[in-house]
């Protein structure tokens, strides 16, 4: 998979989750913030990143930088994905199913943010297991990374698309 140059893309960013976290030290608690951010161009390129800092804006900025480093390309067929897939990360699993035009994005918060940033506008999803935003975002990213077009699979197997699809 070729590395995506985020500087050449018109990216939209969405903050999925901000958490105030505490480190307990001898003198009490030290608070900092973590921000889970998703960036995408709406044309099949999407990335997710985690930023941590003492202040919220700095955590968001770091999260955006991390997301731009972790961009992946998603094979889209029109406004949906080529086939159903299950993505796993930690205790979170996400089932993604292609949908007909006009269905819309049927997904919960963290999964929806990733899919909208990727440019998927018709899809059915089901979140299984953990509802933790970090796990949901990473499970969705894992599923999107695993998607393959029928043409690519046919080429790998040395067959025609008709033979693959039956």
Swiss-Prot record:
Keyword Manganese: no
Molecular function as annotated in GO: rRNA binding; structural constituent of ribosome
Pfam hit, one: Ribosomal_S5
InterPro entries linked: Ribosomal_Su5_D2-typ_SF, Ribosomal_uS5, Ribosomal_uS5_bac-type, Ribosomal_uS5_C, Ribosomal_uS5_N, Ribosomal_uS5_N_CS, Ribsml_uS5_D2-typ_fold_subgr
Domain (S5 DRBM): residue spans on this chain: 11-74
GO cellular component, one term: small ribosomal subunit
Gene3D superfamilies membership: 3.30.160.20, 3.30.230.10
Keywords attached to this entry: Ribonucleoprotein, Ribosomal protein, RNA-binding, rRNA-binding
This protein's domain notes: The N-terminal domain interacts with the head of the 30S subunit; the C-terminal domain interacts with the body and contacts protein S4. The interaction surface between S4 and S5 is involved in control of translational fidelity.
Similarity comment: Belongs to the universal ribosomal protein uS5 family.
Subunit annotation: Part of the 30S ribosomal subunit. Contacts proteins S4 and S8.
The protein's name in its UniProt record: Small ribosomal subunit protein uS5
């Amino acid at each position: 998979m070729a590395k995506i140059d985020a500087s050449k893309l018109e990216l939209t960013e969405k903050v999925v989750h901000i958490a105030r976290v505490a480190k307990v030290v001898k003198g009490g608690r030290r608070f900092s913030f973590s921000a889970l951010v998703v960036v995408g161009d709406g044309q099949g390129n999407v990335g997710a990143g985690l930023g941590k800092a003492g202040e919220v804006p700095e955590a968001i900025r770091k999260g955006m930088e991390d997301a731009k480093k972790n961009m992946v390309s998603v094979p889209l067929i029109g406004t949906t994905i080529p086939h159903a897939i299950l993505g796993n990360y930690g205790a979170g699993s996400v089932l993604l199913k292609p949908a007909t035009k006009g269905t819309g994005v049927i997904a919960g918060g963290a999964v929806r943010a990733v899919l909208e940033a990727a440019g998927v506008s018709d899809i059915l999803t089901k979140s299984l297991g953990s509802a933790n935003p970090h796990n949901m975002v990473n499970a969705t990213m894992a599923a999107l990374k695993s998607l393959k077009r029928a043409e690519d699979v046919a080429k790998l197997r040395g067959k025609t698309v008709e033979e693959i699809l039956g």
